[in-house]
């Protein structure tokens, strides 16, 4: 993976270029328009010589007749080229932003779960929105400035040398001095830009935490805490912005001082008799006006460095994510529908970034069509076992088999298609009820199938009371639904999926007693002829399981039926006694 420090600005831009290249036609048109725009400005200045020497000098009064027409024509050309260049650059910029966001979005969807465990949602959102916008807007803005101001400088130099090479050659000493000034501030600009992007991620994260947890903030009186946190990161962002302004502001007067010294020397040199003999009023006016006109593009080119560095710093941040390794999907085996035999053999697993294994030497068989329940205290490793079946994480040692084959032999899509998951943390999308139930497969299922799944999940009662029934939009993460209603939508989703392997991770935890009793009947029906792994704190929901496995600190300590484990008077019996007070 590339390190930010290892990539120079040029290397970063070269890597970005393939993203821009498909839209180079727009860049070419914009470039031509910008050059014509700059040429019109330069030509406008050149008109001062005939105007002063001939027009007002009364040697050729016809100049005063055709000059206004030329000026009008140049202004029309300037307006047209300005519009064309702005439109084309915006078109290219929009395409680049869209392409970068698509690449980021697609790459992130292929990242392992461990990646999201380490990254805050706010930071990742900032990368997709703010940073990708910075790449395009900064780069396109810099391109406009470089082409237009660069063409202006070249045009002005050519005109100045044409009219008086003696005076113009003095300005050549400007080039290396300006180059040194730009190089000095470049590194500073890029470092500040990287800090600004990181701080923007912190601002987004802080705001997102408050917005998502606003109820908790209100209940626990966390307004002051959240305000202080947001103020802190906002002030940090302000300070980084001021550092950028400071660096940019220092470079401006330096360039202007260098240019003013050159202008002063030109005025002094113009007083030499050998130089004055070849100068007219028009010539000295054109040359001197051109030198003054050079100040603006030189200043713009100095500032463009900060703008370009901002874009390249954002680009490096995005490339860091794009260089991150995606989920390993090296399996070749594809299966339409598994029988459902699942087996853990001597499995040890440690979460990335941790030293202590979450699971140690797990041996577990879940025969096809049978129900195995995992029981244990919070943090014992029950949900971890379930997440390994879907290969959200890869194990350290041992192997996990499905139908006698290692899970790593299957393609991820084929493997995960065999599993339906209902967890305690239900995520619903800002879409209709029907589309949430048939998520990712809306075209595969009929309306009747969706309704049947909702009915079996005992969800139609509250769905029918909604304004638009199954077509009701339920808001972000089902904000318009109660916890129990959200859980039943998730169960309906699993019923409709009809996968041979079912994972119920606290599937009824958010339901009241009456709803739980009703939904349990549906779950019992759903579990028939399916391999089911049930994780539950409520022991009453797993008494009928074919086998109950007790997990303690990542190790299986007991296994057996409900009655067997009660008679054994071990950990399960203690948990049962705590819940039922026996």
UniProtKB/Swiss-Prot annotation:
Enzyme Commission code: 7.5.2.6
Annotated ranges, domain ABC transporter: 342-578
Predominant location category: membrane
Enzyme class: translocase
Compartmental location: Cell inner membrane
Gene Ontology cellular component list: plasma membrane
UniProt cross-references to CDD domains, sorted A to Z: ABC_6TM_MsbA_like (cd18552), ABCC_MsbA (cd03251)
Residues that bind ATP: 376-383
Residues making up the signal peptide according to the UniProt record: none
Its membrane topology: Multi-pass membrane protein
Keyword Plastid: no
Segments crossing the lipid bilayer: 16-36, 63-83, 153-173, 253-273, 275-295
All copies of domain ABC transmembrane type-1, residue ranges: 28-310
Keyword ATP-binding: yes
Domain of life: Bacteria
Record keywords: ATP-binding, Cell inner membrane, Cell membrane, Lipid transport, Membrane, Nucleotide-binding, Translocase, Transmembrane, Transmembrane helix, Transport
Stored NCBIfam families: MsbA_lipidA, PRK11176.1
Role: Involved in lipopolysaccharide (LPS) biosynthesis. Translocates lipid A-core from the inner to the outer leaflet of the inner membrane. Transmembrane domains (TMD) form a pore in the inner membrane and the ATP-binding domain (NBD) is responsible for energy generation.
Family statement: Belongs to the ABC transporter superfamily. Lipid exporter (TC 3.A.1.106) family.
Quaternary structure annotation from Swiss-Prot or TrEMBL: Homodimer.
Domain topic, free-text comment: In MsbA the ATP-binding domain (NBD) and the transmembrane domain (TMD) are fused.
PANTHER family: ATP-BINDING CASSETTE SUB-FAMILY B MEMBER 10, MITOCHONDRIAL (PTHR43394:SF1), ATP-DEPENDENT PERMEASE MDL1, MITOCHONDRIAL (PTHR43394)
Protein name: ATP-dependent lipid A-core flippase
Organism: Shigella flexneri
Lineage of the organism: Bacteria, Pseudomonadati, Pseudomonadota, Gammaproteobacteria, Enterobacterales
Gene name for this UniProt entry: msbA
């Amino acid at each position: 993976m590339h390190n930010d420090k290892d990539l120079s600005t040029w290397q970063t831009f070269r890597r970005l270029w393939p993203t821009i290249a498909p839209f180079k036609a727009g860049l070419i048109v914009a470039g031509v328009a910008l050059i014509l725009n700059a040429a019109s400005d330069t030509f406008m200045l050149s008109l001062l010589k005939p105007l002063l020497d001939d027009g007002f000098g009364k040697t050729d009064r016809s100049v005063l007749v055709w000059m206004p027409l030329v000026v009008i024509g140049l202004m029309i050309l300037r307006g047209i080229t300005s519009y064309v260049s702005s439109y084309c650059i915006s078109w290219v910029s929009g395409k680049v932003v869209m392409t970068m966001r698509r690449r980021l979005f697609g790459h992130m969807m292929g990242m392992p779960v461990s990646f999201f465990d380490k990254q805050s949602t706010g930071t990742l959102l900032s990368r997709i929105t703010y940073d990708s916008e910075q790449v395009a807007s900064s780069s396109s803005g810099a391109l406009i400035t470089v082409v237009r101001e660069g063409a202006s400088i070249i045009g002005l130099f050519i005109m100045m040398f044409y009219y008086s090479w003696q005076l113009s050659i003095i300005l050549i000493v400007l080039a290396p001095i300006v180059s040194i000034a730009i190089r000095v501030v470049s590194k500073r600009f890029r470092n500040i830009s990287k800090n600004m992007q990181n701080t923007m991620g912190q601002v987004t994260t802080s705001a997102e935490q408050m917005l998502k947890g606003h109820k908790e903030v209100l209940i626990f009186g966390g307004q002051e805490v959240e305000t202080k946190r947001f103020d802190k990161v906002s002030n940090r962002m302000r300070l980084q912005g001021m550092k950028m302004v400071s660096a940019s502001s220092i470079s401006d007067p330096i360039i202007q001082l260098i240019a003013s010294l050159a202008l002063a020397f030109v005025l002094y040199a113009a007083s030499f008799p050998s130089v004055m003999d070849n100068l007219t009023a028009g010539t000295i006016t054109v040359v001197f006006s051109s030198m003054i006109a050079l100040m603006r593009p030189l200043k713009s080119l100095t500032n463009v460095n900060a703008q370009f560095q901002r874009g390249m710093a954002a680009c490096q941040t995005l490339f860091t994510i794009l260089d991150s390794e995606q989920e390993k999907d090296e399996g070749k085996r594809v299966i339409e529908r598994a029988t459902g035999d699942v087996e853990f053999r001597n499995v040890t697993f440690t979460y990335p970034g941790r030293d202590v294994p979450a699971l140690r030497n797990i041996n577990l068989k879940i025969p096809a069509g049978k129900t195995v329940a995992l029981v244990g205290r919070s943090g014992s490793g029950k949900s971890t076992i379930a997440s390994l079946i879907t290969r959200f994480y890869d194990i350290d040692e041992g192997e996990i088999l499905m139908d006698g084959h290692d899970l790593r032999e299957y393609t991820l899509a084929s493997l995960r298609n065999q599993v339906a998951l209902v967890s305690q943390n239900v995520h619903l999308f800002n879409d209709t009820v029907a589309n949430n139930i048939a998520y990712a497969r809306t075209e595969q299922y009929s309306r009747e199938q969706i309704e049947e799944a909702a009915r079996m999940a005992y969800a139609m009662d509250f769905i029918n009371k909604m304004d638009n029934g199954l077509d009701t939009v339920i808001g972000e993460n089902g904000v318009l639904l109660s916890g129990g209603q959200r859980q039943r939508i998730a169960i309906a989703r699993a019923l409709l999926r009809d996968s041979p392997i079912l994972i119920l991770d606290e599937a009824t935890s958010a339901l009241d007693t009456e709803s739980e009793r009703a939904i349990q009947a549906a779950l019992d029906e759903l579990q028939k002829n399916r391999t089911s792994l049930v994780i539950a704190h409520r022991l009453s929901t797993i008494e009928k399981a074919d086998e109950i496995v007790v997990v303690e600190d990542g190790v299986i300590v007991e296994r057996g039926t409900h009655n067997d484990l009660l008679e054994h008077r071990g950990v399960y019996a203690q948990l049962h006694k705590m819940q039922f007070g026996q």
